[in-house]
UniProtKB/Swiss-Prot annotation:
Protein name: Homeotic protein ultrabithorax
Annotated organism of origin: Drosophila melanogaster (Fruit fly)
GO cellular component, one term: transcription repressor complex
GO MF, any single term: sequence-specific DNA binding
Gene Ontology biological-process entries: anterior Malpighian tubule development; anterior/posterior pattern specification; cell fate determination; dorsal vessel aortic cell fate commitment; endoderm formation; haltere development; heart development; imaginal disc-derived leg morphogenesis
Motif QA positions after renumbering to this chain: 368-383
Motif Antp-type hexapeptide boundaries: 239-244
Expression across tissues: In the embryo, expression is seen in the epidermis, somatic and visceral mesoderm, and the peripheral and central nervous system.
DNA-binding positions: 295-354
């Protein structure tokens, strides 16, 4: 049974899973290798736990709201609880890899998977016997007696790379079975019945192991290259839904990429985002939130007492020292930055007032000069009239 209840690094890390994992994985690897493989094979990783923890140690009981649901699920599946669960773990001990049952490489009794899982694993009896009982028995016997037979043991050094490469390869097949596809194909063709399949499996193991390591190395390098290129592209062309709502669009010549990203979020387009932001500009959005989605800080309001004290201090001195600014901040329940900005604004206001006063004085002077000139002209005219008479 392939479920999360059999994995030591399962969904919640229940203590029953740790015992089942230790029993299921003891037939193929030591505890260190099984722990390293389980760290990469466990999906999803344990919540709040390190993936490199020692899985062979007995875990302490965790007080979690999920314990009751896990216990109920175990009882529902296995009936009497721990007894049936341990028996199930013993039954899958022979055909499990790293504590996990291989659902792809089941080529023993059913006679399946020529160039795929069965052949790549070296169990050629199932494929050569055309699905009969003799072929299945030959494959199982050869896998148990021959330490190199049966299902191939994935090298721990290749586990992360080959697993990533397997999932990156979209040509078909499973991440486990398609690694030894070519060697498995040769073994399945040569086996005509159960006995021939059992004899030929010894030759298939060596070829499968060589092809396994070669494919693992090649796929690992290809996986790293593909992963690096995908991360580079993702960092350069990252698009978020709020960009469309805000009317912003990254400069990318490939418009189809942007359209595909927008389509997966309900068909949002840049034009729709602009119309949406314009329609909400004057109706639903508050004053402190702009049309482009950026927060705009509101004006700081001061009480009458704070304004009076600040005006009194400004009347005494237009510039404050650091010590005096700290004292006023504590006295008025304001921050130093607020007081500093208030004094800056007050000095600018005073400067504008002084400039306005100067302009008014100049205008008054000009008006007085014009009046004086007009009066002098009138007096000169009157004086000239008297002289003419």
């Amino acid at each position: 049974m392939n479920s999360y209840f059999e994995q030591a690094s399962g969904f919640y890390g229940h203590p029953h899973q740790a015992t089942g994992m230790a029993m299921g994985s003891g037939g193929h690897h030591d505890q260190t290798a099984s722990a390293a493989a389980a760290a990469y094979r466990g999906f999803p990783l344990s919540l709040g736990m390190s993936p490199y923890a020692n899985h062979h140690l007995q875990r302490t009981t965790q007080d979690s709201p999920y314990d009751a649901s896990i216990t109920a699920a175990c009882n529902k599946i296995y009936g009497d609880g721990a007894g049936a669960y341990k028996q199930d773990c013993l039954n899958i001990k022979a055909d499990a890899v790293n504590g996990y049952k291989d659902i792809w490489n089941t080529g023993g009794s059913n006679g399946g998977g020529g160039g795929g899982g069965g052949g790549g694993g070296g169990g050629a009896g199932g494929t050569g016997g055309a699905g009969n009982a003799n072929g299945g028995n030959a494959a199982n016997a050869n896998g148990q007696n021959n330490p190199a037979g049966g299902m191939p043991v994935r090298p721990s050094a290749c586990t992360p790379d080959s697993r990533v490469g397997g999932y990156l390869d979209t040509s078909g097949g499973s991440p486990v079975s398609h690694r030894g596809g070519s060697a498995g194909g040769n073994v399945s063709v040569s086996g005509g019945n159960g006995n021939a399949g059992g004899v030929q499996s010894g030759v298939g193991v060596a070829g499968a192991g060589t092809a396994w390591n070669a494919n693992c190395t090649i796929s690992g390098a290809a996986a790293q290259t593909a992963a690096a290129s995908s991360l580079h592209q993702a960092s350069n062309h990252t698009f978020y839904p709020w960009m469309a709502i805000a009317g912003e669009c990254p400069e990318d010549p490939t418009k189809s990429k942007i359209r595909s990203d927008l389509t997966q979020y309900g068909g949002i387009s840049t034009d729709m985002g602009k119309r949406y932001s314009e329609s909400l500009a004057g109706s639903l959005l508050p004053d402190w939130l702009g049309t482009n989605g950026l927060r705009r800080r509101g004006r700081q309001t001061y009480t009458r007492y704070q304004t009076l004290e600040l005006e009194k201090e400004f009347h005494t001195n237009h510039y404050l020292t650091r010590r005096r600014r700290i004292e006023m901040a504590h006295a008025l329940c304001l921050t130093e930055r607020q007081i500093k900005i208030w004094f800056q604004n007050r000095r600018m206001k005073l400067k504008k007032e002084i400039q306005a006063i100067k302009e008014l004085n100049e205008q008054e002077k000009q008006a007085q000069a014009q009046k004086a000139a007009a009066a002098a002209a009138a007096a000169a005219a009157v004086q000239g009239g008297h002289l003419d008479q």
